[in-house]
């Protein structure tokens, strides 16, 4: 089983734009690739051009087993490993779909759209394109027809039995903000790429901070756990250009708890005071 997983990983590692659950990759990798692609485009074309955003419906539940087996036959040259891979896929009945959250499934679905990736990069000669699992971006130069390119990409995806979500797929001029994987990207007139985190995350973070106060008062949460939770939320926004959001959340925390969330010593001192009071 381990050898099979390593084979899947080796088969997918070369598709560097497919950032998901591989060592050194993930959403941070995908964000960095998109920023680099936007800067590369800006140095040559300014803000002229468009970005195509594509999302697939039911990416895991609807994947074709037949198409996966074709990939196995091409990439897994060891027949024993190929049989193990086929058997893993066949654990899902009906000829379609793979389970979420299972490592072999993740490896399969990282590599599965590679034919589409190669089509975009090689046959369509698009320099700036990438994806995070089923979320694709394709940056189209101003001398190319974005609608035509999108139609070709959709046709290629459908040949792999992938269903494009028409409601989530669109063409956006680079002069306007766009969302990719729930993050907002803005290419400014100076070529700077501004990234903002998911705005709904701010509302959730505010609710959680207020709820943590009740948990602390009821003894359901320690100050060490509070430190971990709050700074995890702040770290998410600190990874974006969301300085003002971070400041507002820190101010809310101070108004609720009466101390700054920036130093772990503040949490430990408050925890010791509570222990003394309880004793």
Question: Residues of each region from the PLM?
Answer:
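Glycine/proline-rich, flexible active-site/cofactor-binding loop segments
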Residues: 1-24, 85-92
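Hydrophobic recognition helices of helix-based DNA-binding modules
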Residues: 3-4, 120, 186
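A generic secondary-structure signal for well-formed alpha-helical elements
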Residues: 3-7, 72, 76-80, 157-161
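Beta-rich nucleic-acid/ligand-interaction surfaces
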Residues: 13-29, 137-140, 171-177
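Conserved polymerase palm-domain catalytic core
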Residues: 32-133, 137-152, 172, 223-242, ...
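Polymerase palm active-site segment centered on the conserved acidic dipeptide of motif C
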Residues: 128-131, 138-215
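Active-site and adjacent loop segments of nucleotide-processing enzymes
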Residues: 183-279
